[in-house]
């Protein structure tokens, strides 16, 4: 009887034991992650506003602001040129960033952290499976921070709701999400010339009495205040007292139905899918004091630039999975975009304020597992000449052989400029352009990665870029006084750019301690 009771207890323990492997997160690109509840140095790398390793990013003086990038990669694949305004999108949740959960018990994750000067960040995720087939996930990120300097306050709310559904017979799948994001920033434009002087020099000040006279000490010297600009940054004057914001809503759905299903292996051999995305963005820039930093403003206009962007994408795709031939996905997409700027009630005459584009894409993805390695091929072809995004990418990855793993990738891509490179409208006279003659940017990239256990990982990338497009400050900015005025132009380099970077990661264990280094 005692032995039977022990067996029953062991059976109950096995039944009730759940590891983190049961808590899964699915992404659109096919990635599957398990919830990680461990405490390690990698978690500390991600314990920041972005919730990711910010190794290549240089932070601004406040959270929720933009970042300076210290490294670039040119092997990204996109199916449609972006809106632009990339400084506003570092912490923006794209459709590919949304996770679809599958959890055996209710799951909660809460991230909380204080920030600069009376600031807080809270990011909470609550996920629950109402049944084995249906999951609902609610997530919200809210933040506010005053910042160290004048007029650098930030605040934002980023709401995400996702649903993951798999039918009981596993022949139908649905991924659905809704996002609502609102990000607000005060824009200081950096320190004014006086602010820079006080910041660098930190001069001392004489103390004056009520009549404006200097106060004399007993030794004959005058009483002074020692001022340290580094410790009192909130008093340093800035160039601007402006505000900017990005507001966005998105609805996304991906439905997949198996046409031929292998019941023995519980895998789909042939399936048909439909995907829909509707995204709306509203960008605003308000300068009630009409700063002269960006030049002259149209007469009688209060600076309140506004932009509206609508993107709608419809995709139909077919997926086949045969052991001998690998997994093949073929899709056809229709994309419509509309970008509209405020016309200030017709005061900006002779300019267009609306740009509408349509594009059709044909793309394919092939994955094949061999004995010791895997090959992945991605191709995308735009069928129209405007708003082009063409690429061909091939990836070769080996299995771990004697703890050594190798990954190689080659990419050739061509894409049209971002929309704000082509088209922009503002109350500032110098910030209105329509560049219809920009060439498509072309790039060829080769990357490699070699890793041995967790001891060392070396990765490198070599890229050749033609017709690179970027924003550059004009050398003859307005009156030539670079310190007082800013004029930015869209620039395209006709010559070729060669870009190379190499990154080294190493981890050495000493008992329960680890020594980790990353260099680039």
What positions do the PLM features span?
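Bacterial Sec-dependent N-terminal signal peptides
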Residues: 1-4, 326
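Acidic, small-polar-rich N-terminal luminal/periplasmic segments of exported/outer-membrane proteins
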Residues: 3-104
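Outer-membrane beta-barrel translocator/channel fold
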Residues: 54-58, 146-158, 162-247, 397-455, ...
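Exposed, low-structure sequence patches enriched in small/polar residues
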Residues: 78, 103-105, 246-289, 303-520
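Short structured motifs
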Residues: 94, 121-124, 238-239, 302, ...
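Outer-membrane beta-barrel translocator/receptor signature
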Residues: 101-150, 154-159, 169-172
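An acidic- and aromatic-residue-enriched active-site/binding cleft used to recognize and process polar
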Residues: 115, 131, 139-145, 179-181, ...
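Outer-membrane beta-barrel domain signature, strongest for Gram-negative TonB-dependent receptors
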Residues: 169-301, 308-336
């Amino acid at each position: 009887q005692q032995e039977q009771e022990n067996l029953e207890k062991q059976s109950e323990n096995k039944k009730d034991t759940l590891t983190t492997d049961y808590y899964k997160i699915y992404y659109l690109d096919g990635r599957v992650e398990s919830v990680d509840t461990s405490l390690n140095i990698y978690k500390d790398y991600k314990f920041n506003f972005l919730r990711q390793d910010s190794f290549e990013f240089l932070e601004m003086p406040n959270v929720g602001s933009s970042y300076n990038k210290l490294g670039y990669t040119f092997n990204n694949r996109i199916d449609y040129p972006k809106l632009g305004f990339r400084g506003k999108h570092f912490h923006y949740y794209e459709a590919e960033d949304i996770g679809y959960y599958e959890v055996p018990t209710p799951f909660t994750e809460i991230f909380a952290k204080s920030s600069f000067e009376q600031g807080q960040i809270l990011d909470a995720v609550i996920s629950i499976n109402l049944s084995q087939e249906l999951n609902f996930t609610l997530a919200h990120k809210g933040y506010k921070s005053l910042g160290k300097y004048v007029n650098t306050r930030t605040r934002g709310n980023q709401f995400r709701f996702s649903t993951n559904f798999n039918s009981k017979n596993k022949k139908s799948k649905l991924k659905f999400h809704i996002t609502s994001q609102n990000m607000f920033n005060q824009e200081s434009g950096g320190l004014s010339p006086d602010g820079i002087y006080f910041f660098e020099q930190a001069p001392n000040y004489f103390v004056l009495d009520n009549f404006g006279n200097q106060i004399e000490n007993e030794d004959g010297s005058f009483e002074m205040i020692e001022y340290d600009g580094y410790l009192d940054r909130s008093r340093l004057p800035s160039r601007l007292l402006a505000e900017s914001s990005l507001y966005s809503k998105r609805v996304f759905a991906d439905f997949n139905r198996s046409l031929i299903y292998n019941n023995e292996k519980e895998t789909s051999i042939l399936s048909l899918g439909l995907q829909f995305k509707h995204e709306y963005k509203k960008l605003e820039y308000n300068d009630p004091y009409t700063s002269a930093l960006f030049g002259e403003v149209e007469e009688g206009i209060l600076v309140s630039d506004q932009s509206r962007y609508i993107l709608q994408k419809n995709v139909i795709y077919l997926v086949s999975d045969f052991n001998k031939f690998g997994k093949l996905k073929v899709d056809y997409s229709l994309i419509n975009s509309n970008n509209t700027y405020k016309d200030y009630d017709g005061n900006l005459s002779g300019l267009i304020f609306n740009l509408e584009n349509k594009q059709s894409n044909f793309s394919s993805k092939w994955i094949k597992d061999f004995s010791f390695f895997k090959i992945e091929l991605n191709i995308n072809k735009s069928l129209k000449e405007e708003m082009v995004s063409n690429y061909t990418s091939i990836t070769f990855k080996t299995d771990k052989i004697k703890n050594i793993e190798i990954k190689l990738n080659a990419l050739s891509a061509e894409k049209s400029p971002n929309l704000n490179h082509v088209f922009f409208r503002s109350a500032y006279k110098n910030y209105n352009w329509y560049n219809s003659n920009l060439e498509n940017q072309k790039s060829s990239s080769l990357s490699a990665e070699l890793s041995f256990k967790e001891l060392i990982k070396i990765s490198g990338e070599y890229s050749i870029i033609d017709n690179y497009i970027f924003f550059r400050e004009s050398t003859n900015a307005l009156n030539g006084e670079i310190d007082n005025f800013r004029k930015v132009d869209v620039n395209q380099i006709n010559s070729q750019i060669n870009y190379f970077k190499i990154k080294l990661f190493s981890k050495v264990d000493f008992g329960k301690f680890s020594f980790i280094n990353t260099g680039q």
